[in-house]
């Protein structure tokens, strides 16, 4: 299931994505992208459809999640990260924090501080935790993961 957060005006809502947007048609040329609108926040309650359906190309997609407090990042989680920076490879993952304001939507501008000269980019995978969790065993991790983005 693909859950999106979107706006059709001032109100932000969630929906289940079906199909593709108009600018990414199927090989046949069809585009049937739509959102089945959800009630509430699927991070807090199980997804429940309202019955409303809106076309995907008629909405503005925003950040898929609203981080409730912070983003916990994992740096140098493989040998190439450490060696690429010219530093010694750490014995394990290095954690770092980012403010929740660092999470933006697909078409939102990246706002840089005045002193910054460039944007560092790389592919990232975010694991969305769907319930409070601390010191979870690897074997039990699946029970607290809501999804990926």
Model regions: which residues?
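N-terminal non-catalytic cap/leader segment that marks the start of a structured domain
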Residues: 1-93
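Glycine-enriched loop-and-adjacent helix/strand subsegments that border the catalytic/binding cleft
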Residues: 68-149
């Amino acid at each position: 299931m693909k859950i999106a957060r979107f706006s059709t005006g001032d109100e932000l809502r969630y929906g289940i994505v079906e199909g593709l947007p108009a600018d990414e048609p199927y090989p046949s040329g069809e585009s049937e992208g739509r959102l089945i609108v959800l009630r509430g926040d699927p991070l807090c309650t199980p997804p429940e459809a309202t019955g409303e359906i809106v076309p995907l190309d008629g909405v503005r997609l925003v950040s898929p999640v609203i981080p409730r407090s912070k983003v916990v990042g994992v740096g140098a989680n493989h040998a190439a990260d450490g060696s690429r920076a010219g530093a010694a490879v750490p014995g394990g993952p290095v954690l770092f924090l980012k403010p929740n304001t660092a999470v933006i939507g697909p078409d939102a501008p990246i706002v840089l501080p005045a002193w910054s000269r460039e944007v560092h980019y790389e592919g990232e995978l975010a694991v969305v935790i769907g319930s409070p969790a601390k010191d979870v065993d690897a074997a039990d991790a699946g029970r607290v993961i809501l999804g990926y983005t």
